[in-house]
């Protein structure tokens, strides 16, 4: 089978290539990381599919970084939460600021995608300042880098420290709410159970260990 790839910023080209090959009768899988329907390729390929009426598109669910990163940290998204991308390539920064303020003022747990890049080095610090207008400085935050990949790392900090964290585009950031707390070595929003191990900066979590503490909902 042929493996075809395009560089960053050529997603539409990749979608058209996949649809064109499918139109010619080939069985094609368009692969992206995480869940194709969350900041992924499902949306553009479905829009472009109107130009390829003979192609049937099937979207296969995956695990987005909010889910897989949450499992590493424990259970930070056990209740209502919001996901916000800090990338302004497709969304104006002013819109991102309004959305951050809205979810922070409502005390959602917040998952941040694309927290920083070479061209957007200040986005995470600016986002932290916005959230600090509504959330307490000691709000528990966490981060996971290279989720599920070699070199996976994770850690925790307070919201007052988040703006100084050296994130990158492979990092997913989690910001808790007023109820978020640390349970043993993992953290939870009211309820969750987890297994934790640490070696250096590597952290992991998983279900089903009855010997570890349980954070019970009120």
Listing of model-derived features with the role each one plays in the protein:
Residues 1, 18-20, 43-47, 72-75, ...:
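Short, glycine/charged-enriched secondary-structure capping and boundary segments
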Residues 9-14, 65, 89-91, 148-151:
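A short acidic, often aromatic-flanked loop/helix-cap motif at beta-alpha or helix-coil junctions
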Residues 1-57, 68, 163, 194, ...:
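Class I S-adenosyl-L-methionine
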Residues 26-28, 105-217:
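A contiguous loop/helix-start segment that scaffolds small-molecule binding in enzyme catalytic cores
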Residues 38-106:
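Class I SAM-dependent methyltransferase SAM-binding "motif I" and its flanking Rossmann-like core
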Residues 10, 14, 41, 92, ...:
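General structural feature for long, well-ordered alpha-helical segments within catalytic domains
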Residues 3-5, 57-59, 83, 141-143:
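Conserved beta-strand scaffold positions in the cores of enzyme catalytic domains, especially
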């Amino acid at each position: 089978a042929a493996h075809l790839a395009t560089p960053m910023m050529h997603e539409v080209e990749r979608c058209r290539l996949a649809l064109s090959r499918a139109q010619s009768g080939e069985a094609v899988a368009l692969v992206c990381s995480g869940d194709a329907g969350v900041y992924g390729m499902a949306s553009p390929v479905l829009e472009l599919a109107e130009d390829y009426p003979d192609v049937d598109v099937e979207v296969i669910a995956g695990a987005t970084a909010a889910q897989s990163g949450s499992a590493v940290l424990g259970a930070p998204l056990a209740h209502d939460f919001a996901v916000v991308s800090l990338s302004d390539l497709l969304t104006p920064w002013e819109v991102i600021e309004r959305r951050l303020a809205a979810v922070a003022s409502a005390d959602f747990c917040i998952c941040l995608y694309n927290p920083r890049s070479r061209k957007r080095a200040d986005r995470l610090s600016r986002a932290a300042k916005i959230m600090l207008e509504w959330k307490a400085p000691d709000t528990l935050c966490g981060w996971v880098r290279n989720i599920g990949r070699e070199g996976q790392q994770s850690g925790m900090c307070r919201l007052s420290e988040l703006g100084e964290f050296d994130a990158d585009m492979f990092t997913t950031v989690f910001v808790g709410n007023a109820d978020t707390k640390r349970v043993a070595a993992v953290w939870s929003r009211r309820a969750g159970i987890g297994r934790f191990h640490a070696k250096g900066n590597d952290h992991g979590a998983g279900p089903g260990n009855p010997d570890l503490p349980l954070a019970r909902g009120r």
